Every structure is written in C-alpha cells, then in structure tokens.
C-alpha cells in the first residue's frame, strides 16, 4: 500500500513538472493580438549582424531599417518591441515554439516558407544591382561587355550570376567575376578603378554609399535577376497581428514616416506598391 501511494505521489510530481516545463514555452496556436495589447509588448526575432536591416552598433544598441520600421509600427498600438537576437537558421522553430512572436529582419517571403509561416505584405524588394562609377558612363548592363565585374564570394548575387549565365556572365570579361571576401573590399576596389562594376544587394549598396555620402557619384543598375521580397513572418494563427502590421505600414507611408525611415538608411524610397 505504501509503495502504491509512493508511486502515485511520484507520478503526480512528474506531471506537475512536465506542465511547468512546457507551459511557458509553447504559445497556443491561437490569435494572440489581445495578449499583445494587454501586455503592451511583443518579441521580434532578428539576426543582429544583418547590416543595414537589423544589427548592433559599437555600443551594442540595436539599429537598422527594420528596427526603426517595426518600432514605428507598434508605436501606433502603444506596444513596445522587445528585440531578441536569434540563430537565423532556427528562426521558424523559434517562432513556432513561442520564443518570439514575429520574424522581422530582411526575411524573404518564399512559397516554401508560406507553408508554415503567415506573411505580411511585402514591404521591400531587395534586388541584385550593378554599381558603377558615373565617370565610367555605364548606364545599362549591356555596356558591361568585356568589363571587369566584382562580386562577393558565396553571395546570392554571385549564385544568380552563375545560375543565369545568359544575363550577365556571358557579357563580362573572362565570363566571370572577381571575387571578394566582403563587399567593403569590393567597394574599395570599385572606387579605385580596379574593377569596372560590382554586383551587390541593393539594400547594402544604398546603405554603404549613403553612409559615405557618395550616392550621387555612382549609377545603380538592376542586374536583371529575380529579387527577394522582404516581409514580416508570424505564426499561422496570428491573423489579427499580421492585419495590424499591414495597416500600420500603409498608414506610415501615407504619413510620410515610411519614406523618412527609408531615406535615413538608403537615401531613397524603397516601399513596394503593396505599401503605397
């Protein structure tokens, strides 16, 4: 009898522990908007090294285009954003487990991701562009025939360059691009005329040239590859949250605040037609 009571007591204790362990981590698959409104806070997961979308400055402060934009969105609802740096490879898992409430940091909307994630409207298209000095008089990609092109090793731009050779690879000198470990190195060579043009993400090109106050000295040409559509990712059940994000983005554009944030980071209006 004593043994039976002991077993029952132990089983009850284990059940309590199991409940405590799982209750705080996994958010139920429900529409959580009322909880966000009541708690006045929301957790957004981001990669804190993705310049210029969301990253940390030298003091450790979170800054970037997406940081500013998200803060403005939730300011409209009197909700404070808690920024949570995450392992970007595990972003969907963090969202599903309830460790974060949104993914917002240059997050590309794809058909594969749409199977498990509810996306907001696309607010920015990150294109692959060709950057050239205006003094080179190159205003379209056809003028890159036999010119020296640079690209970052392993970048999405260089991948597109190789997988779509008819667009650019067949035109440039040696039918290949000079490869660099970083965009900064490539941009230095571009500035010093060691290469004629550079294949690069538009968001990074605009940010870098804006920071250097050199936008006016360069031509930025669409490379002709398919761009990445950036959107905000939520759990499938959080339909009200996504609706509120979409509404706020449109309101921010009408008020001119979206353009203000865009010009701060890129020197131009990057909004998609979904937002305008």
Language model features with spans:
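C-terminal motif of bacterial Sec signal peptides marking the signal peptidase cleavage site
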Residues: 17-19
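Extended ligand-binding regions for polar small-molecule ligands
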Residues: 21, 67-76, 142-148, 153-155, ...
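Extracytoplasmic small-molecule ligand-binding "clamshell" domains
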Residues: 26-106
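Periplasmic-binding protein-like
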Residues: 48, 125-132, 202, 210-247, ...
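Ligand-binding cleft/hinge of the Venus flytrap
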Residues: 56, 70-79, 157-179, 209-214
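Acidic, polar ligand-binding/catalytic clefts
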Residues: 71, 80-143
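Short helix-initiation/N-cap motifs at beta->coil->alpha
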Residues: 82-93, 176-188, 228
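A ligand-binding cleft/hinge motif common to bilobed small-molecule-binding domains
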Residues: 90, 107-115, 160-163, 188-192, ...
């Amino acid at each position: 009898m004593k043994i039976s009571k002991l077993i029952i007591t132990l089983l009850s204790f284990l059940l309590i522990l199991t409940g405590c362990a799982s209750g705080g981590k996994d958010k139920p698959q429900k529409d959580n908007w009322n909880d966000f409104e009541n708690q006045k806070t929301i957790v957004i997961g981001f990669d804190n090294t993705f310049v210029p979308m969301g990253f940390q400055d030298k003091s450790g402060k979170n800054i970037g285009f997406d940081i500013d934009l998200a803060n403005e969105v939730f300011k409209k609802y009197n909700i404070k954003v808690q920024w949570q740096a995450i392992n970007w490879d595990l972003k969907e898992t963090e969202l599903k487990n309830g460790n974060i409430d949104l993914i917002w940091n240059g997050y590309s909307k794809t058909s594969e991701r749409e199977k498990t994630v509810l996306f907001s409207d696309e607010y920015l298209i990150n294109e692959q562009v060709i950057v050239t000095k205006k003094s080179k008089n190159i205003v379209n990609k056809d003028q890159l025939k036999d010119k020296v092109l640079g690209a970052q090793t392993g970048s999405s731009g260089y991948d597109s360059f190789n997988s779509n050779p008819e667009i650019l690879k067949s035109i440039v000198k040696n039918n290949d691009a000079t490869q660099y470990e970083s965009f900064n190195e490539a941009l230095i060579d571009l500035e010093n005329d060691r290469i004629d043009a550079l294949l690069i993400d538009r968001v990074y090109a605009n940010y870098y040239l804006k920071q250097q106050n050199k936008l006016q000295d360069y031509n930025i040409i669409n490379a002709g590859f398919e761009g990445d559509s950036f959107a905000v990712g939520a759990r499938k059940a959080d339909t009200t949250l996504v609706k509120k994000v979409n509404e706020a983005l449109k309101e921010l554009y009408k008020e001119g605040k979206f353009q203000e944030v865009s010009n701060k980071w890129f020197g131009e209006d990057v909004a998609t037609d979904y937002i305008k």
